[in-house]
């Protein structure tokens, strides 16, 4: 069938890909046909003429005849087939810009190689290394039946006879004296005649063996009756000793059924499970005492041993968290009496230290309404995290809010290797194993939602679902509700939720996309589930991408296809793919990206794994490298990988990797790799934190290890306005000002904007913008003051500030989208203009940028405090030291890894955002310190795949400002004013590349001179001034040498996806002074539909080194200390000033004049102000990268 498709029909390729293919062809009259992106069943005819691409829309009518859309008055011609239409327009002067001459063929693909590999892998999997030796499951899949049905078709009778005779001989050699005579006769009858009949069933493709089932039913007839009679007694005994049974749970009624083998297996499994669990429950009951019988599915009290300083002396303390009673109990000894306790209402905030990962500050309110600051040191960071999670659970459980504003989500992915799972898989759901794992103290905290994705899953849906629910009940003592289950062949996704959330979940949607052989067979692909949780949209995608280390590009294409064709979420958001349809999108699965190293380094790789030198291997991880190059998972995030590669193990052990695999084409190498991954993407300024990311160590039936990840995710409730619809203060308004889009296209068609949001009654369409020429290959579309004012359905700030506006820029001729973005409405202040920015993407590719200003008008009111505001992260001097360490790192991956991850580089402070995806604003829109705006000649093309900086002042969805931790949204209200670090105003510093570090240091010195606290020196000792002694020139150069070690970052002008948006007055000045400012269109010009220009020489404009002189700040290489300065002299005076020694002072040791001069010089104090210049902390205004998230 593929031969029937004409070579010029490229199907569902993107518009940008079509332009690329035609530009590559380079001949006038080259053409191709692609599917329309805006109209179903329509096509787009793309023609190249004089290095320009012209696009004509081919529309079907009611009779399925095709016609080329023409201007008014032009007669329309209809064709029954596309071939006829193309042949007609190959003639000259038929109305096109030129006649069709040279069809652009499809790109060659190695589909045969992939098909051969997949077929060989499925057929030859049993003898591959390591040997599987896995029993067949009760319900074999079609893939398993295929080898049996096609095996040796030329001599079926000989095979059957030999098999029957062999089995008879084996039966005769066995001791059958203990078998009942009727059972023995039934077995012999089956081997003599019925075995052949079952073989015929297999030959027809059926997976059913009716005669074997009949034989087993006969053999188990008496056993079935005995099990039915025994099970109720055992269940009653189990309930008697079950202290965690929910009160409404009743025993299942025993329905007598047929004694089938499947029923017997289930009953026997239930029987053995009951026998083993009864003994465990009795032991637990005797150990815990009778009082535990009243504790059903409650979280037991957990005690933490901590240290607390009193008058400088560390003392051991014990903190007991009782979630159910809502108390934090402080005791001096574990078994002693309570010294004091604090109720959940009196515990105001938890503040984590970044310098000491096991230190925690607890702010509590006393009876006299005073706020106390209690500092405790835990045994390790995991204990601290477990304590924080328990207290957060306590606050959530006793919250007065009827609806949650934060939920926890478990994500699990496992390639089961076509093997049945082990009986016990609870470690997976407890996040136990390698990597970032959960503490034991958090075991009793159930997650709100469990999402489990599997690949090569041999079980049926019911069997797998029963195992999952049984395992979760064992872990949480809760029976979870099934939200959705969806399967594409052996790729499956299951979503389970707490029973209490049943009425909060709605709009459930499932879909799948096949990306296997010829995109028709389901051996590879993806399954997805989406739903609404109150007012928040959630999406989950489980994918199994093409295998093979050399198939990296095909995996990228798999991802793009899934992105385009997976139909989930709100159907009204048709211009947007799944990356913009959901507040939170989680992508999991066997992505099959490998560690790209030579095969002869296999043993060296294994040695690095044993030594846990994962960073050396991650530098060659295909997925991280492809994301760095912006080729896949654009704007997604992934938690830091701290666990061993999850593929390819020998089965039944995790101590040995099996990296060789015998194929029909020869030996194949599968180097140990992180094939199984979890990534996520959330809307701007939405709370999301990854709490764990790792793999299990005790589930070994597959050659993959299961991977787990857990998240805190912010959610919103279904909001009902407190204001009446006619009241004056309920008139909200969203106004966009001075907006413009920069697009990577040569099309001269007009463009308009569409605004979509759940806070709008329907989408809003703008007028056409004015086109201006940008740099090479770019078009600037300005919308000025013509954009419509948006009217939200609810104007309460508590609702509106949590909303987002989706933007799509579309062609007026074809209505096809050229880019989509997202703007957050969470602004520092309303009634004022704020700068906004969002990258524009289309089908997973970067297509441009959208900039402008926004003004939001809301009704009276304020936002309430969120539950995730309860836990903060305190910034201290550790952030600077750690980032300086990163600056000198030789690890190439450090140059683009995120700096927001704790404890890597400290940018997550009380006023910063751990969530790297998004940016915040400066306080009330004020300009930020350490900022330098690019000159117009540095603002080059906004379309660049060059490496981007990690963090910046601009990020998706907002304007300028430093990152803000997700644990504290910018508008979170405060119940109190504490003296914690950074609570007051402090200078904020943007991130700078190593190359720009000198400029930022100079700016920081001036800022710190103005904000630094004064200190008095003790005259009996040496100066504590931060000014250095006279040192050799080489030592003065040391900071600069350190900055040269990492690979250089690109020029600020090249990474233009993050060019800073100047303020309004700056925009005007740029218009008037810049030579590159685009010239406005003076008058209307005739335009041809979808006129698209391209050039064979598509070189990107680059600029020379625009870096300015960088002042050397040698003081930054040491820890300076401030001194008291009664009078602030000028810099020239400081260099000459000497201070006389006061007369009343006693005689002092003689000091040199240099010491006296330095003693009265103003230095920088990093002890109180931690804004150290370091890599990953200061950035130019560039596009923002997430935690391992690439723009």
Swiss-Prot record:
The keyword Cell division does not apply. Residues 1032-1046, 1162-1184 have a biased composition (Basic and acidic residues). The modification Phosphothreonine is found at residue 964. It catalyses: a 1,2-diacyl-sn-glycero-3-phospho-(1D-myo-inositol-3,4,5-trisphosphate) + H2O = a 1,2-diacyl-sn-glycero-3-phospho-(1D-myo-inositol-3,4-bisphosphate) + phosphate; a 1,2-diacyl-sn-glycero-3-phospho-(1D-myo-inositol-4,5-bisphosphate) + H2O = a 1,2-diacyl-sn-glycero-3-phospho-(1D-myo-inositol 4-phosphate) + phosphate; 1D-myo-inositol 1,3,4,5-tetrakisphosphate + H2O = 1D-myo-inositol 1,3,4-trisphosphate + phosphate. Its EC number is 3.1.3.86, 3.1.3.56, 3.1.3.36. Residues 122-148, 947-994, 1021-1191 are annotated as: Disordered. Tyrosine phosphorylated by the members of the SRC family after exposure to a diverse array of extracellular stimuli such as cytokines, growth factors, antibodies, chemokines, integrin ligands and hypertonic and oxidative stress. Phosphorylated upon IgG receptor FCGR2B-binding. The SH2 domain interacts with tyrosine phosphorylated forms of proteins such as SHC1 or PTPN11/SHP-2. It competes with that of GRB2 for binding to phosphorylated SHC1 to inhibit the Ras pathway. It is also required for tyrosine phosphorylation. Interacts with tyrosine phosphorylated form of SHC1. Interacts with tyrosine phosphorylated form of DOK1. Interacts with tyrosine phosphorylated form of DOK3. Interacts with tyrosine phosphorylated form of SLAMF1/CD150. Interacts with PTPN11/SHP-2 in response to IL-3. Interacts with receptor EPOR. Interacts with receptors MS4A2/FCER1B and FCER1G. Interacts with receptors FCGR2B and FCGR3. Interacts with receptor FCGR2A, leading to regulate gene expression during the phagocytic process. Interacts with GRB2. Interacts with PLCG1. Interacts with tyrosine kinases SRC and TEC. Interacts with CRKL. Phosphatidylinositol (PtdIns) phosphatase that specifically hydrolyzes the 5-phosphate of phosphatidylinositol-3,4,5-trisphosphate (PtdIns(3,4,5)P3) to produce PtdIns(3,4)P2, thereby negatively regulating the PI3K (phosphoinositide 3-kinase) pathways. Also able to hydrolyze the 5-phosphate of phosphatidylinositol-4,5-bisphosphate (PtdIns(4,5)P3) and inositol 1,3,4,5-tetrakisphosphate. Acts as a negative regulator of B-cell antigen receptor signaling. This is Phosphatidylinositol 3,4,5-trisphosphate 5-phosphatase 1. The lineage of its organism: Eukaryota, Metazoa, Chordata, Craniata, Vertebrata.
